[in-house]
């Protein structure tokens, strides 16, 4: 698995992957820059040219996938955010701006801001249930090379994302757009077809014998390398010993039953079989480091599509309606769709071939099924954003001001984005090696910032600090299958077992979070970020403190209860849940476990082996409390977080501590949808973590997706959250703050993006920033 995409500890970076984001992780609508509105009402609108100087932004290591189509990690996505503009833009609350051409005035924090973009959008719900998204593009917008941005560039971009061979992280192709399925059918990649045909295939009507030999040579080599990464990871993390058989490693990776003399290919094929022959899907879920497609030398050669049957020549729901207008028709209401339409716009003349574009003849800038021209530009992006890419060298990207930027030429001539260890972020501001970065907001870093400033505050003469609620939240996860009774994860007994642990964990949240974060984080009671409009508020009807009722539904705590009494009450309530789960209770302790349950469980905490994690204190205190009532809790403080993700992928984890990243829309499909109606064949991409299986929850998640009424959806999501809490598969822990720090000596403070939020990052108005010297 890609460790850089994982969201661990107090560092909430995307994934994605998970696309934890809808359209996520790599989609432009979540992250920053161009998607967050052009300049605010304070913008000067200066288009006369940029001034001199260079600003340095420090961030994590980049992977050099700077393509709007194929960027996977947050650091890579930052580059495309600066180089591109998006079809739609969002405001400081994450809401879509519909009238970007003239700009929309919206109030935030008592101030009025104007949000501008490259398009206007009109949404019309039709009587037949379809929905029309009518776009009008702003005149005069140009790419950094001076070429105009037109509706043809938008159409080209959408067809790349919809291509049957597209394998990036965006999921535009999954939207209910009229004609999408018909366009994507009847085409498959050589890669997939050759796998289906097998190594001994004798039919060479679609490829040559030499191609087949090359394919299988490279495929088998990549498979061996893929398995080796798993073996090395299992050995490095103590799951296996050096020299253990492939069978032994596979068993610890969730693939038991292989023969004792199994080979690496046997293991690889077993993984592929689990995913119904889909190697790419298997790789995304099971990788211990590299993706299979990156390990296979000739993958791009075989990623082209070939005809396998009837296929529509176009997507009927994407229509060019005028010189600068476009209509996209959805077959039904989908609350996620508007955010997925906020995609980066890529220039046809750069990523495609203008000679192969003729809208009336169903030609869209590249041969259908062949994205080679797009893939060729992965390391060197071009767009219409505030800065234009120059080079990537020695871990540093150099960019220069885009003199064609539609919302005013940036005041700072150059930007360098350099890879740096997070531990060096604060000191780099002091020493002058960076001007802007996002350090972890730990006690240590907060103290270092205060020490650097002569006034002893977080903002002073050396460093200016801006904090916002992080776009996500911390949690404790409990796998429903591995912490269950009689192998029935959805039974009341199993839920009671998990509630016993959850009750104890919840009792120590206030102590642990205040100790670790001080006033820089707060305890939350529902598994959703406080930044979301769907998050229940203490003043809402039905709001409850998480896991604060006993097995009979009575309150565990009373107002004004002392901490010692609170912890004692939690232990008593937990004992009640253990008893209800089927445990034998004698003299205030559990003495025997029911079938399928245990007297000892493990929780993994990625604290670096030093306990450096916000939930570590919860676990050490819970360990002592549970011991007093007869349950042994093993707290595994991991020096390498990949061990935790490996166990989760292999369905071996019992309990763990981590964090989720959020998106502007609170859709719960990715994490909780289990696809019970189809036997779990297509669950949400992260459902494997909790393995929650609930038809009612599935139905509500889909129901919420099919409405754009925010109040209605909030009601549905509250019911979803209550259902998730009842499963006790997730204990909500904290909403933390994240910070951006600036050099007070080198950046003009009054030009920094005002009223930054979780959705409106520091570079949302980077074109207005100025250097002090």
Where are the model-predicted features located?
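Append "and occasionally in soluble cytosolic enzymes with long acidic Gly/Pro-rich linkers
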Residues: 390, 398-400, 492-624, 632, ...
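Short, low-complexity disordered leader/linker segments with a strong preference
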Residues: 1-53, 234, 586-594, 770-773
């Amino acid at each position: 698995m890609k460790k850089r995409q994982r969201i661990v500890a107090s560092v909430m970076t995307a994934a994605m992957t998970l696309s934890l984001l809808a359209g996520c992780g790599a989609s432009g609508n979540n992250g920053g820059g161009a998607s967050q509105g052009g300049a605010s009402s304070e913008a000067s609108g200066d288009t006369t040219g940029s001034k001199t100087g260079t600003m340095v932004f420090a961030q994590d290591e980049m992977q050099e996938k700077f393509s709007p189509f194929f960027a996977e990690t947050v650091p890579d996505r930052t580059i495309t955010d600066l180089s591109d503009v998006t079809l739609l833009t969002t405001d400081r609350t994450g809401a879509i701006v519909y009238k970007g051409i003239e700009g929309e005035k919206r109030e935030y924090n008592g101030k009025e801001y104007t949000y501008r973009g490259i398009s206007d959008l009109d949404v019309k719900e039709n009587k037949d249930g379809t929905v029309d998204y009518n776009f009008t593009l702003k005149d005069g917008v140009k790419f950094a090379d001076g070429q105009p941005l037109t509706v043809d560039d938008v159409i080209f971009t959408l067809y790349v994302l919809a291509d049957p061979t597209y394998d990036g992280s965006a999921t535009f192709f999954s939207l209910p757009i009229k004609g999408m399925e018909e366009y994507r059918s009847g085409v498959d990649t050589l890669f997939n077809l050759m796998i289906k045909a097998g190594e001994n295939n004798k039919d060479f009507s679609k490829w040559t014998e030499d191609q087949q030999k090359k394919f299988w040579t490279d495929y088998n080599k990549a498979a061996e390398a893929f398995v080796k990464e798993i073996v090395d990871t299992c050995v490095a993390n103590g799951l296996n010993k050096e020299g253990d058989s492939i069978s032994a490693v596979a068993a610890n990776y969730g693939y038991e039953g292989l023969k004792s003399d199994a080979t690496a290919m046997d293991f690889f094929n077993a993984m592929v079989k689990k995913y119904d022959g889909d190697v790419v899907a298997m790789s995304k879920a099971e990788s211990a480091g590299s993706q299979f497609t990156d390990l296979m030398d000739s993958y791009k050669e075989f990623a082209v599509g070939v005809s396998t049957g009837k296929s529509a020549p176009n997507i009927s729901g994407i229509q060019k309606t005028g010189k600068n207008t476009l209509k996209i028709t959805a077959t039904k209401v989908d609350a996620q769709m508007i955010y997925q339409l906020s995609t980066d716009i890529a220039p046809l003349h750069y990523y495609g071939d203008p000679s192969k574009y003729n809208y009336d003849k169903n030609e869209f800038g590249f041969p259908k099924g062949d994205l080679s021209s797009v893939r060729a530009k992965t390391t060197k992006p071009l767009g219409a954003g505030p800065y234009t890419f120059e080079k990537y060298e020695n871990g540093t990207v150099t960019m220069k001001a885009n003199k064609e930027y539609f919302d005013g030429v940036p005041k700072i001539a150059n930007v360098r984005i350099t890879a740096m260890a997070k531990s060096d972020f604060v000191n780099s501001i002091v020493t002058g090696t960076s001007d802007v970065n996002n350090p972890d907001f730990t006690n240590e870093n907060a103290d270092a910032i205060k020490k650097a400033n002569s006034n002893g505050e977080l903002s002073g003469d050396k460093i200016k600090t801006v904090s916002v609620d992080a776009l996500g939240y911390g949690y404790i996860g409990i796998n429903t299958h591995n912490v269950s009774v009689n192998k029935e994860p959805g039974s009341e007994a199993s839920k009671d077992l998990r509630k016993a642990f959850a009750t104890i964990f919840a009792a120590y949240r206030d102590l642990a979070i205040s100790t670790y974060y001080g006033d820089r984080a707060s305890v939350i009671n529902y598994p959703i970020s406080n930044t979301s409009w769907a998050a229940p508020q203490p003043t809402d009807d039905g709001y409850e403190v998480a896991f604060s009722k006993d097995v009979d539904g009575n309150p565990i705590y009373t107002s004004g209860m002392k901490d010692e009494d609170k912890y004692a009450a939690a232990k008593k309530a937990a004992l009640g849940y253990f008893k209800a789960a089927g445990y034998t209770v004698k003299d205030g302790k559990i003495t025997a476990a029911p079938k399928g349950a245990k007297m000892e469980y493990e929780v993994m905490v990625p604290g670096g082996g030093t306990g450096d994690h916000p939930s570590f204190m919860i676990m050490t205190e819970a360990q002592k409390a549970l011991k007093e009532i007869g349950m042994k809790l093993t707290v595994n403080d991991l020096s390498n977080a990949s061990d935790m993700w490996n166990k989760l992928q292999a369905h071996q984890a019992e309990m763990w501590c981590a964090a989720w990243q959020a998106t502007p829309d609170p859709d719960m499909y990715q994490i909780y949808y289990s696809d019970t109606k189809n036997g779990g064949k297509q669950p949400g991409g992260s459902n494997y973590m909790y393995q929650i299986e609930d038809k009612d929850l599935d139905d509500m998640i889909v129901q919420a997706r099919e409405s754009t009424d925010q109040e209605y959806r909030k009601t549905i999501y509250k019911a979803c959250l209550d259902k998730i809490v009842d499963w006790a598969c997730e204990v909500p822990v904290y909403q933390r703050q994240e910070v951006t720090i600036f050099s007070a000596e080198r950046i003009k403070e009054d030009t920094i993006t005002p009223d930054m939020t979780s959705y409106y990052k520091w570079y949302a108005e980077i074109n207005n920033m100025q250097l002090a010297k």
